[in-house]
Amino acid sequence: DHKNSPEKFYDNIEHHYEFIGDKLIIGKFCAIAEGVKFIMNGANHRMDGITTYPFNIFGCGWEKVTPTIEQLPFKGDTVIGNDVWIGQNVTIMPGVIIGDGAIIAANSTVVKSVEPYSIYSGNPAKFIKKRFSDEKIEFLLKLEWWNWSGEEIFDNLEILTSEAGLEELMNKYSKRDAIN
């Protein structure tokens, strides 16, 4: 959702250093608003010393206290599922997994993983509610509409974007399963 161009998206990823080895993985059909920041593992400091300050950044001999990769906290890859909507000015911390179909409200800070098809808001982001019942969420996770062909998605646009569409799909697929 960048107002200028998607090429500027990389500007939203902070403290990503290849030598650390973490990845930002973003699923299909995500709406990521302007101002979203992905903080990667390179932002983490050692916390086991008296100070957390990274003196090695000074160079000129100060790098003698450069921590090894093993000494730095590593939270893992940051994963954004499919069909996720992330509101404006959200900050996502390292190692967070945001489940398929989730919504993150504007100005939130996500510090823990988010369940699929749920809404989170605040700093730190807290669970607000599920978008659908557990039965419907389970169905949607199995359906994986984002993996359909472009033609199949196009043919089902009205269903995918309507409130009644979920019931229609559940009925359609339950009948299909009963036949098979």
UniProtKB/Swiss-Prot annotation:
It is an enzyme of class 2 (transferase). Gene3D superfamilies: Hexapeptide repeat proteins. Keywords: Acyltransferase, Antibiotic resistance, Repeat, Transferase. Its EC number is 2.3.1.-. One of its GO terms (molecular function) is acyltransferase activity. The keyword Acyltransferase applies. GO terms for biological process: response to antibiotic. Disulfide bonds: none annotated. CDD domains: LbH_XAT (cd03349). InterPro entries: Hexapep, Hexapep_transf_CS, Trans_hexapeptide_repeat, Trimer_LpxA-like_sf. This is Probable macrolide acetyltransferase. It comes from Lysinibacillus sphaericus.
